[in-house]
UniProtKB/Swiss-Prot annotation:
Family: Belongs to the ThiC family.
Name of the gene: thiC1
GO biological process: thiamine biosynthetic process; thiamine diphosphate biosynthetic process
Chain residues that bind [4Fe-4S] cluster: C570, C573, C578
Cofactor(s) the record lists: [4Fe-4S] cluster
Reactions performed catalytically: 5-amino-1-(5-phospho-beta-D-ribosyl)imidazole + S-adenosyl-L-methionine = 4-amino-2-methyl-5-(phosphooxymethyl)pyrimidine + CO + 5'-deoxyadenosine + formate + L-methionine + 3 H(+)
Protein name: Phosphomethylpyrimidine synthase 1
Length: 596
């Protein structure tokens, strides 16, 4: 049976126990033009100066928050009920969608009818929503009609992170090298609309996922992080995957992909979506393959189509579709050192060879678009021929597939379906800029979403590092979202600790890229932490860090038992050799001399 909320999170309340950033932080909400636009942020309040002085200056720093109600002490979260449907009123007031009388997917109806006592089913049976006759419900469609939706206003507030409230000291920032990005000092709802209308950004928010807090993926916005979870035929259960999702967003996952390939895929996904405040992505071909007993040759358009509808009606926000794997590219892929390393790519390759014809993902793409626009499912056009080794980087198969993805992007845009493009993979550092340039050239500026790339193949067990190195460079060049890699990459299914390490490594990469691009306000957090470090405000340093618990734990473990945490040194230099302590004493001495 599904475990209770407190058994998964470690607390009887709605707040996740030991949440990232609880040290010196609190959750706040910024209200928009209407009371139901409430944007969550982390507020870090820091006292600057002597703690016993009444005139102590307070610095407030606001950070992007992906953790949803799970970190709100005032929220009574129950995973058996799911999260509040915060977007439901926005969806209903547009009057362009309808609630269906039953599920449209045959498989979905079968799963509902086949429920047995004791099964791990989400308690609430909800009816899905889809576009009304002749209507298009995508955020791109609204944007192209000149409509600024509540989702767009929500995103503008979220991306700005209350930069206007920063003290001047923290606003100082190096210009950066934007490399073609176009970032205004203030993100407005109209700017969000314009970027979505042009296809340069996507808002992955299915109308059947009203629990989703709107976010945006685009090269002119903050770099985002995706975390992969999902069971396999060999390990994991539904409650473990829900736990991993909550854990992933706690550490900063902007989106989560459920890549389950084991049993109970439908039920696992329902639990995850109903409890997720971030967009959920999937690779539908995985579940379609399960439906035919793992035999790729037995796949059909009819089974895949039903799977798309099933998942869209559950609320999946974006689909990875490997429609760029064309039969004419298979020979080039066979010449590689490591062949085809994408699961979706290899599945469709096997199908194409068995049937001697083009992939139905490509030939039926117009019909796939019709499904997507009825629910506002964003496409993540999969790189089924991405290089799986440095040896194969930027080869013919990869680049020719990219051209096909550009063709499919234009097809999707004719339907006002939102699109992002998946990228490699394994690419050495000196070839990363070329990857970005080719993506922009062939895919018309659609957001790039890359798996790293890993910049070397020699680090099994440390591939979260090789990926973060490549991800930093690729995001600086223009990638909009990085898919995290964990230490278990190439080795096995990640656990909670792997998820944490993978996300933190890629949050570092994303932030470093924002700094390099000169993203407005990106340096404020660095400035605040540096000031706290120079003033030996240890708790403030921890609060501003990406992993406060780890930093605090390391310091505590290294201090002598009788030492207080107010000491103005660490065990690296000790009390007599700390350069910052010496510098401070010199400053204080100089100031005292001037007063005399």
């Amino acid at each position: 049976m599904m475990r209770k909320f407190h058994e998964i999170t470690g607390t009887e309340t709605g707040a996740v126990s030991g949440e990232a950033g609880t040290i010196g932080t609190r959750k706040v909400y910024v209200t928009g033009s209407r009371p139901d636009i409430r944007v969550p942020m982390k507020e870090i309040v820091q006292k600057v100066g002597a703690q016993d002085e009444s005139g102590t200056e307070l610095l407030k720093i606001y950070l992007y928050d992906t953790s949803g109600p799970f970190t709100d002490p005032g929220a009574a979260v129950n995973i058996r009920a799911g999260l509040p449907a915060m977007r439901e009123a926005w969806i209903e007031e547009r009057h362009d969608s309808m609630v269906l009388s039953q599920l449209s997917s045959e498989y979905g109806r079968q799963r509902l009818a086949g429920r047995v006592e004791g099964g791990q089913y989400f308690p609430e049976e909800r009816l899905p929503r889809r576009a009304g006759k002749g209507c298009n419900v995508t955020q791109m469609h609204y944007a192209r009609k000149g409509i600024v939706t509540p989702e767009m206003e929500y995103i503008a507030i979220r991306e700005n992170q209350r930069r206007e409230s920063l003290p001047e000291l923290l606003k100082k920032q190096h210009p950066g090298d934007p490399r073609g990005t176009r970032m205004p000092q203030v993100i407005t709802p109209e700017y969000v609309r314009d970027e979505v209308a042009a296809g340069r950004a996507v808002i992955p928010c299915n109308i059947n996922h009203p629990e989703c807090e709107p976010m945006i993926i685009g090269r002119n916005f903050l770099v985002k992080i995706n975390a992969n979870i999902g069971n396999s035929a060999m390990s994991s259960s539904i409650d473990e995957e829900v736990e991993k999702m909550i854990w992933a967003i706690r550490w900063g996952g902007d989106t989560v992909m459920d890549l389950s390939t084991g049993v109970d895929i439908h039920e696992t996904r329902e639990w995850i979506i109903r409890n997720s405040p971030v967009p959920i992505g999937t690779v539908p071909i995985y579940q379609a393959l399960e439906k035919v007993g793992g035999q790729a040759e037995e796949l059909s358009w009819e089974i895949f189509r039903d799977t798309l509808i099933e998942q869209a009606e559950q609320g999946v926000d974006y689909f990875t579709i490997h429609a760029g794997v064309r039969s004419n590219l298979l020979e080039a892929a066979q010449r590689r050192l490591t062949g085809i390393v994408s699961r979706g790519g290899s599945i469709m390759t096997k199908w194409c060879k068995a049937h001697g014809q083009e992939s139905f993902l490509y030939t039926r793409f117009e019909e796939i678009c019709e499904i997507a626009k009825a629910y506002d499912v964003t496409f993540s056009l999969g790189d089924g021929l991405r290089p799986g080794s440095i040896y194969d980087a930027n080869d013919e198969a990869q680049i020719e597939e990219l051209k096909t993805l550009g063709e499919l992007t234009e097809t999707a845009w004719r339907h006002d379906v939102q699109v992002m493009i998946e990228g490699p993979g394994h690419v050495p550092m000196h070839m990363i800029q070329e990857n970005m340039d080719l993506q922009l050239k062939y895919c018309h500026g659609a957001p790039f979403y890359t798996l790293g790339p890993l910049v070397t193949d020699i680090a099994p067990g440390y591939d979260h590092i090789t990926s973060a190195i490549g991800g930093t460079m690729m995001a600086w060049c223009g990638t909009a979202m990085l898919c995290y890699v964990t230490p278990k990459e190439h080795l096995g299914l990640p656990d909670k600790n792997d998820v944490r390490e993978g996300i933190v490594a890629h949050k570092i990469a994303a932030h470093a890229a924002d700094l390099a691009k000169g993203h407005p306000g990106a340096q404020a957090r660095d400035n605040a932490l540096s000031k706290a470090r120079f003033e030996f405000r240890w708790q403030d340093q921890f609060a501003l860090g990406l992993d406060p618990e780890r930093a605090m734990g390391i310091r505590k473990a290294l201090l002598p038992e009788d030492a207080e945490d107010k000491e103005q040194y660490c065990t690296m230099c000790g009390p007599d050799f700390c350069s910052m302590k010496i510098t401070r004493s010199l400053r204080e001495g100089a100031a005292g001399g001037k007063e005399e």
